[in-house]
Each structure stands twice: as C-alpha cells, then as structure tokens.
Regions:
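Active-site-adjacent betaalpha module
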Residues: 1-122
Length: 122
C-alpha cells in the first residue's frame, strides 16, 4: 500500500509476500522465530473473516505453540469485510456473504482465542 510505504517508519518494515489468504508456509513463522524480541503484533486488514482472521490466528497459535508471551492486537477500526446480499449472490452464482454478521462473529472468535480485539489504537 503506497500510504503505508509513505510513513516515516517504512524503512523498518519487513514485507513477506503471500499468494493466498493463508499466512502459513510463507516464511512468517521462521521470521518470528528469528525475532524473539517482537512482543506485540498489530493486525490490520480488509477482510475480517478471511486474510485478517488467518493472520491473527496464525500469530496467536504460533505464540501459543512456542510458549511466547507475544501479544496479538487487532484494532476493530482497522478491519472490515465485504457484503454480498442473498439476492445478489443468487444472481451472480456466488455464496451470500453477510458482511456485518461475519465481521462481528470473526472478531468474537479471534477474541475468544486470545487475540486482543480493541476498538482502536491510541
């Protein structure tokens, strides 16, 4: 994203490309293992129930598996998902995707699994 790359801290980013909604098998686990000093991961994204969920859960489960006291924080105002009403889905041959419902269900599920879902970052 050009907006993120324009921030003054952009030189500190580590960009790990991926080819699907999954965060597994892309080198993220190896990077996390090589950087035990990272205590907090902040997750943002454009599909709460897809990529964002996969990333947050991958980070949380990795920390659990390796007994790390690493925080995974997801600001609610930095995620959202899309909506496809039933009638539109029927017309285009897709599954309905109730955006508001999925957004809140997946936020709840992440919180239930140890991701710190917060309203916003201060």
């Amino acid at each position: 994203m050009p907006e993120l790359l324009a921030l003054p801290i952009a030189s500190e980013y580590t960009i790990i490309p991926k080819n699907s909604i999954s965060s597994a098998g892309i080198g993220l686990g190896e990077w996390m293992g090589a950087h035990p000093e990272v205590e907090t991961c902040i997750v943002v994204g454009d599909c709460t129930d897809l990529c964002t969920y996969q990333l947050a859960m991958h980070l949380r489960l990795y920390a659990n598996e390796h007994q790390l006291q690493r925080r995974v924080v997801l600001p609610e105002n930095c995620v959202q998902t899309f909506d496809i009403p039933v009638d539109v889905a029927a017309q285009i041959g897709a599954f309905a995707h109730p955006g508001d419902l999925y957004h809140y269900v997946f936020l709840y599920h992440m919180a239930h699994n140890g991701v710190e879902v917060v309203k916003e970052l201060c």
